[in-house]
Amino acid sequence: MYMRILLSCSELGLGHVSRIIPLGKRLAAHGHEMFFFSGGKAHEMLQKEFTNVYKCTPISWYENAHGIITSASLVNLFFPLPLFNMDKNRLEIKNSNAWETIHRYYDLRENIHDIAPDLLVADGDINALRLAQRWKIPSVYIANMIRPSYGFSAFLSPGERVVERYVKKCSKIIIPDNPPPYTISEYSIGNLDRLGLNAKVEYVGGFVDTTPVKGSQDHIFAPISGPPGTRGKLIKTLIPVLEKLKTKCVISLGTPGKKVSTKIGNCELHTWLSDEERQEAMRNAKFVIFSGGHATCFETIKYSKPSICIPTQPEQLGNAAKLQDLKCSITAKNKSQLQKAVVKLEKEQESYNRNMSALNEFSSKFKGLDRAVDIIETSLD
């Protein structure tokens, strides 16, 4: 049965769109007619890959050069705040999340009659689930965060309840992660039995192909990702530590566009790496330093690379904590902790390598993208 499928994804980081792109390509190859919604950088990336791509208002945390500011983000839920736009190098007023949410919903709704989807698939986009419920469109939710319990402000609990109300209306919930006890996003998903979601949830495995790939140990690889403020915070933490090491370091600054490269000490800095360049850098790394984003977690699993996580927001903090519990990673929050983590990881490299190999062996049993496609294609049966 061929369907008209609407896919909408959150643009908080690029992890959501990195899942939607291969999923959309696979579904399109199966003959389904695809329509895509997102905002910000995610919208730009979707436009490069597909034709039916619609722009909607992005929803974002309040962040500056120090990263995400929790207190300001709480205020910004309901009130606009001044914010320096680092991409455009000017002071602007950031609209409240309430304003962004309302406008995003109407952006989605504007084209719903013309698209007339048979199914709506949302990756981290609660507005799309709300639209599906209001317009009685069957829906599938893709998420690695449902009821976060690690580093998440208690003030946001009422918002979690609203989210859960829409999630419970889905036909199916796809978690692109390993089943327990090796679920990387365990601390961000929560107790599904208590939430009454167990019957709808399936852990399909990561969308990244985790078939083992052997490489060398030539350098330390630090792929930086996220919004400008997050990237700025990571750069300020990383470079002062890495430039003093004897080991070669490769740093990707996560800025899409024309590639520009330079050197600081023993560090190679690249504004952007192609998929092939990134894979090569990951494959030949001794270990990886990153923020703890879910997609990159599974890249480290694919190449069996131990890591150091420098989380900049609660979801990443939860992922980092789980990897640390599995003795596959070390969490660092500042330059001092990063320096100690590098020393510890180099000293105990063999032990961490063994743990990562065991995690890779378990993860490679699952083909998350294949299973997600099966679930979506049979969701209307």
What is each PLM-predicted segment?
Residues C9-I21, G229-G232:
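A short, glycine/small-residue-rich beta-strand->loop->alpha-helix junction that serves as a flexible
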Residues E11, H30, M34-W99, E268-H270:
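Conserved nucleotide-sugar phosphate-binding/catalytic loop shared by glycosyltransferases and other
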Residues G24, E202-F287, C297, L317:
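Donor-nucleotide binding loops and adjacent catalytic segments primarily
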Residues W135-Y203:
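Active-site-proximal region of nucleotide-activated glycan assembly enzymes
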Residues I330-T331, K335-S336, K340-N360, D381:
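Conserved donor-nucleotide binding/catalytic region of nucleotide-linked donor-dependent transferases
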